[in-house]
Regions:
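Hydrophobic alpha-helical membrane-associated segments
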Residues: 4-15, 42, 93, 120, ...
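ABC-type nucleotide-binding domain
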Residues: 165-398
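Conserved catalytic core of two-component sensor histidine kinases
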Residues: 115, 122, 243
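An intracellular "coupling" helix at the cytosolic face of ABC transporter transmembrane type-1 domains
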Residues: 15-22, 26, 32, 36, ...
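Pre-NBD coupling/linker segments of ABC/ABC-like ATPases
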Residues: 153-166, 391
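Cytosolic ends of transmembrane helices, especially the final helix of ABC transmembrane type-1 domains
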Residues: 49, 73, 121-148
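A hydrophobic transmembrane-helix motif
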Residues: 1-13, 69-115
Length: 398
């Protein structure tokens, strides 16, 4: 029986692994569908698509149910076979032992030992099989996690100290080309941004504006060319030193499920409480924070869900004001807020940007018309460059 059980376990685990991969993929698809439905429920309701979206979600639940049932059905025959072999083993061994005892070939002590061995052996075998099945399912999950962890990290081997401001531009892109996989999104882009100046990036969506900001922040590395800060290639600078020089206000703000105070203080963890309050005042968010149930000690929901979009944006600006980095990137900072909040945010941005080097990504004219230089980016290339008056006088996208 032991030999048969061994081969049953080997064969069943192969089937378990194959079905586990399928079930894991469907579980991920269901999670995405649920998140998509919940986050987009307002849009779906506005466009009268709740029925269609609900049907898609129901379909995902049905597929998950089907895959789970198929997984359990794939295990049932092996479990039945295992129990059958264990049962037959007991049925054969016990009568044989009694027969041998009756013939005087087994002592009573040995007979009791055999009976106890039979009952104690097959129980752990069944338990071991169940645990092996669970481990196989976990192995399928770990394979997917390991695939993510196996992705190459950005190398952080820079050892050069970042110099203080000198004759070199604060920021320079030199013949930069970048691609997401096979899709090239920037091609031979070059520009400079001097200290305490404002450079605006405009152009059609998908043209590569946000990619420029992400490359400067070193979320990715360029495929060709160089990104320099004060004359140093950012790949040669320790990543922590580079991050100390840059603050970024994102279009889509994320706040952590923590107190308002801690969400602002992460801009500079050694800041005093009064410095955090002052940053909040400059970001025009002190008053509404004090109206929250516990003021700065109020725990906000995941992602800042308990606050409006404008309130979240002002808290993120307070975080940047507290950090006081010399280079500020504004990525469509007022693109998705209402008019009332926009005026507060513009005041907060004015406080943030004083004495700073600015890289601004925007669609609205009033945001960038006073920029020292405006670059128009289309399909990954700079197609126009100049200040507002110069570009208005030219024929082109601007």
């Amino acid at each position: 029986p032991i030999w048969i059980i061994w081969h049953l376990c080997r064969a069943s685990l192969g089937s378990t692994l194959a079905h586990s991969d399928v079930r894991q993929e469907q579980s991920e698809a269901l999670t995405r569908a649920v998140l998509d439905y919940v986050e987009g429920i307002g849009i779906a309701k506005t466009f009268n698509l709740l029925g269609e979206r609900s049907a898609q979600l129901t379909d995902n639940f049905a597929r998950s149910r089907k895959v789970s049932i198929e997984f359990e059905e794939s295990q049932a025959p092996w479990m039945r076979a295992l129990y059958l072999v264990c049962g037959l083993g007991s049925v054969l061994i016990i009568p044989l032992s009694l027969w041998l005892y009756g013939r005087g070939q087994l002592s009573i002590t040995f007979l009791l030992g055999v009976l106890l061995f039979v009952f104690d052996l097959f129980g752990p075998i069944k338990a071991l099989y169940s645990q092996a099945t669970r481990l196989t399912v976990m192995n399928a999950c770990m394979d997917r996690i390991e695939a993510v962890l196996a992705q190459p990290e950005l190398p952080d081997r820079g050892r050069e100290a970042l110099p203080k401001a000198g004759s070199a531009p604060e920021v320079e892109f030199r013949n930069v080309t970048f691609a997401y996989g096979e899709k090239e999104v920037l091609h031979d882009v070059s520009f400079t941004l001097e200290k305490n100046r404002m450079l605006a990036l405009v152009g059609p969506s998908g043209g590569g504006k946000s990619t420029v900001a992400n490359l400067l922040s070193r979320f990715w590395d360029v495929k060709q060319g160089q990104v320099l800060v004060r004359g140093r290639d950012i790949r040669d600078i320790p990543l922590s030193d580079l991050m100390d020089q840059i603050s970024m206000v994102f279009q889509r703000v994320y706040l952590f499920q923590d107190t308002v105070y801690n969400n602002i203080a992460m801009g500079r963890t050694d800041a005093t409480r009064e410095e955090v309050y002052e940053a909040a005042r400059k970001a025009r968010c002190y008053d509404f924070i004090m109206e929250l149930p516990d003021g700065f000690d109020t725990v906000i929901g995941e992602g800042g869900a308990s606050l409006s979009g404008g309130e979240r944006q002002r808290i993120s600006i307070a975080r940047c004001i507290l950090k006081d980095a010399p280079i500020v990137i504004l990525d469509e900072a007022t693109a998705s807020v209402d008019a009332d909040n926009e005026s507060y945010i513009q005041e907060a941005i004015t406080q943030l940007c004083r004495g700073k080097t600015l890289l601004v990504i925007a669609h609205r004219l009033n945001t960038i018309r006073h920029a020292d230089e405006i670059l128009v980016i289309d399909q990954g290339r700079i197609v126009q460059a100049g200040d507002h008056d110069k570009l208005m006088a030219e024929e082109g996208i601007y």
